[in-house]
């Protein structure tokens, strides 16, 4: 599966040339990136490979049965910040994102709408690519559909069966389940107690009441074929993969048995990330799949949780079709911390557009290399501290107010790029490299 087109990303400046009577300035080196890890319940440094290899990041992608809403955008915006920061700091990154193009919600929506599920998946994946391009999200090195990796899933399920970490349920449909007790560390990622796990497992796609399972919390690895459902051949019988093992196979086959960051929305904390880690660890014989498990908060709309069931989704494509600047959508999402549940409204978007206009007016007239170096150092410091974007916005607001006041800016007229000073160009490049926002 092909990814989307990459935006141009300027190099983060290491120094700023002199401007008129203002001397040149050095930009401080980017501090190490520290992110909150759900498993360890603390903010800690992202571990970099000892051999200088690229930092491995796996982010769970869409199930392509509907358009990209702001909840999706907030998640991919967050991990784009991580990706951009690491690259600006001089590190290589291998970013992997899946598409769950084999799953019940997709089949159900296609059946409801009377369309082929494959065509629906293709259509929505194409729209997702368009939305990511509009938002200037860096494309993953590997953008992978589940259908492309059935052989990898079959291999992992076979390994789990051979190790005794999986078993076949007797009955009309010989489904295969993972024995969640096989790995002693099961539960470390979410840190939930069993009662909470049982409740969420039932709410989020699990089948605790399935007869023949050894334990209610054992998760489906392979669903034996049912009439009318898609199927793929496997040594243990035709069928289709479970959700969690898809991500386990895709991640480990591209990033190795252990990698730096597993990411997604907070609703994936359990069961999805718990089980995908458990499947990978059981198959590979490791204690921990990812060094960080990073989760983004939920987005509400006008005070109500945004959800497909409520039908109150705000779609990226609809906002851009109305003429809103995609950069303003990003800035609006930066107004809240990525781990917090936060609200989206017309007011948030309007404030973001106003804020962006002020930044652009100030950036166009910036002529002080030392001030630019200080602003970039402060911004990188906030980003390094668990992606503290609200503090980044405050820093840029204060900077813009000072610049605009000093030049008496009115109407936010933007100087053409060709006429800008070296300080202005360095600031623009730095913010674009880090935030994906052109000022």
Curated annotation (Swiss-Prot):
Keyword Transmembrane: no
Cofactor: Zn(2+)
Keywords for this protein: ATP-binding, Ligase, Metal-binding, Nucleotide-binding, Zinc
Chain ranges for the short sequence motif 'ERGGDP' region as given in the UniProt record: 203-208
CDD domains with a match to the protein in the record: CysRS_core
Reactions performed catalytically: 1D-myo-inositol 2-amino-2-deoxy-alpha-D-glucopyranoside + L-cysteine + ATP = 1D-myo-inositol 2-(L-cysteinylamino)-2-deoxy-alpha-D-glucopyranoside + AMP + diphosphate + H(+)
EC number: 6.3.1.13
Assigned protein family: Belongs to the class-I aminoacyl-tRNA synthetase family. MshC subfamily.
Record's subunit section: Monomer.
PANTHER family referenced in this protein's UniProt entry, alphabetically: CYSTEINE--TRNA LIGASE, CYTOPLASMIC, CYSTEINYL-TRNA SYNTHETASE
Full protein name: L-cysteine:1D-myo-inositol 2-amino-2-deoxy-alpha-D-glucopyranoside ligase 2
Species, as recorded: Corynebacterium urealyticum (strain ATCC 43042 / DSM 7109)
Encoding gene (name): mshC2
